[in-house]
A protein has these predicted regions:
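RNA-interacting cores
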Residues: 1-294
């Protein structure tokens, strides 16, 4: 089961917060798990590349206060999103909310009251709550040759320089890096593997930018800063993919196109790129007018 949960909260007292709060939501999520099963929280905190969850930054109506701070008045509703891509982890998180372990969470030095947790919805029309399965994502994937995505929080890819071996952050929605990010997370967590090399070769040969409108943004995590991009990007598969219409696409290309559509939908749950557990890379596919697409 894949789940996207939105947790609605308000500060018990007036709160002063930093502009970047993904790491606070990350800490709050681990604390929620810790109250149910300390070992689960401990294992998630260990450094491994494909953790089965993401968090969003805190969302709400904030006012600037001083240099680099945000003011939230007591009682102001805010929300944050967790996506969970593992059945055992989902069961642990559900116990916290269903068994009433606590109605309070701490974000930094501030205490927030939980008012509700939304689990229903289909992720459409701006709704960030949804649930599905890996099987359903793949079975329901379309054969659209156009993909439109929006990157809501700063997104970056950690790439290695082939000459020096050094890693650096890449802040552009290169489709190959996007699909590499999604396919690696898929194969790490899904019971239905995708041939990553074949898919990425397909993407590299056939995908092009239709248009993009992005900006760079900085996330300040306190001890360090991270640059990323936000905005919209449209991709299109071209050449042999579109020639002759969908009825004449060869079987292998059809399979890859279906997988590409599935992964674009999967991005809603897995995020994109680097530090998705700290609020970066929040991504969702956008509806293309006149296609009936999601």
């Amino acid at each position: 089961m894949l789940a996207s949960l939105t947790m609605h909260v308000f500060p018990v007292e007036d709160a002063i917060l930093p502009p970047t709060m993904g790491h606070y939501v990350y800490a709050a999520f681990l604390d929620i798990l810790r109250q149910v099963d300390a070992e689960v929280a401990k294992q998630l905190h260990l450094d491994h590349p494909n953790k089965p969850f993401t968090v969003s930054p805190l969302q709400g109506k904030f006012n600037k206060r001083g240099k680099g701070k945000l003011f939230v008045r007591a009682g102001t509703e805010c929300w944050a999103r967790f996506t969970i891509l593992d059945d055992n982890l989902l069961s642990t998180a559900a116990k916290f909310f269903l068994e009433g372990k606590s109605s309070l969470v701490r974000l930094g030095n501030n205490v927030f009251q939980i008012t509700r947790v939304s689990t229903n919805g289909n992720g459409a029309n701006g709704n960030w709550s949804a649930c599905t399965t890996f099987e359903e994502i793949l079975d329901c994937a379309s054969l659209f040759d156009k993909l439109s995505l929006r990157f809501y929080s700063p997104t970056a890819f950690k790439v290695r320089d082939r000459t020096t071996g050094d890693t650096q952050n890449y802040v552009f929605p290169d489709p190959l890096y996007c699909f590499q990010s999604w396919s690696r997370k898929w194969n790490a967590l899904s019971p239905i593997p995708i041939d990553e090399d074949a898919l990425l070769d397909f993407v590299q040969r056939h995908i092009r930018f239709s248009k993009y409108a992005i900006k760079t943004r900085i996330m300040n995590f306190g001890g360090y800063k991270q640059l990323g991009f936000v905005g919209d990007c449209d991709y299109q598969f071209v050449d042999s993919i579109s020639a002759g219409g969908q009825d004449r696409i060869n079987k292998r290309a059809q399979e890859h196109l279906k997988q590409a559509n599935a992964l674009a939908n999967f991005a809603f749950y897995c995020g994109t790129g680097y530090k998705t557990t700290m609020g970066m890379g929040q991504t969702r596919r956008q509806k293309l007018i006149g296609t009936g697409e999601i």
